[in-house]
Amino acid sequence: MFMILIINNHGQYNHRIHRTLRYLQIPSELVPNTTPLDEIISRDPEGLILGGGPSLERSGNCVEYIQKLEIPILGICLGHQLIAKAYGGEVATAEAESYAQIELEILDEDDIFRGLGPRMSVWASHKDEVKKLPDEFDVLATSSICEVEAMKHHDKPVYGIQFHPEVHHTREGHRVFENFYDVCRS
C-alpha cells in the first residue's frame, strides 16, 4: 500500500502535517524520530517527510534516514536543516528570528513548487537557518529574511523548505504536499 511516513521531530506543527495529508487523502503515518532505520525500511514507504522541531539535538535518527534511504524526502524547517547538515551544509542561528508571514520568491518552479511561482505568501517560524548550501543542492526559493528558503538535491528527489506549508497562514501550502506526493508517485 502506498504510504508516506512523517517523522515527528517534536515540533508544534508535526500533527498538522499529518492532518493536512489526511485531508488531501494522501496515505500517511506519523512516526517518532527514534524509529529504527530497519523498521522504516520494513514499512516500505514511497516518501518521507521530516517535520519541524525545537533543536538539532532532538532529531533522533533523521540524519541516518537522510543518508541511507533511497526514496523522496521533504524536510520542513528542522527537517530542511537536517538535510543540509547531512549533505555537508551549515546551519546556524538566523540573523533575526522569524515568526511571521513572509513573501517567498520562487526561483525554480520545478517539482514541489510546480504552479506556485513566482511569489508565495508563507509562514516562517524558526531561529536557525541554512547558512551554507550543500554542494549537491540548488536554491529553489529565497526571501528577505532567509537566503535558502527551499533547496533541492541535483540528482535525487530530496527537498528542504524552511517555511511551514502545513499551517493555514501559508496560502497554497497544501499544493506543496500535493506536488511532493506527485514526486513520490513518479
Swiss-Prot record:
Its EC number is 6.3.5.2. It catalyses: XMP + L-glutamine + ATP + H2O = GMP + L-glutamate + AMP + diphosphate + 2 H(+). The keyword Acyltransferase does not apply. It is an enzyme of class 6 (ligase). One of its GO terms (cellular component) is cytosol. Catalyzes the synthesis of GMP from XMP. Heterodimer composed of a glutamine amidotransferase subunit (A) and a GMP-binding subunit (B). This is GMP synthase [glutamine-hydrolyzing] subunit A. It comes from Methanothermobacter thermautotrophicus (strain ATCC 29096 / DSM 1053 / JCM 10044 / NBRC 100330 / Delta H) (Methanobacterium thermoautotrophicum). The lineage of its organism: Archaea, Methanobacteriati, Methanobacteriota, Methanomada group, Methanobacteria. The gene is guaAA.
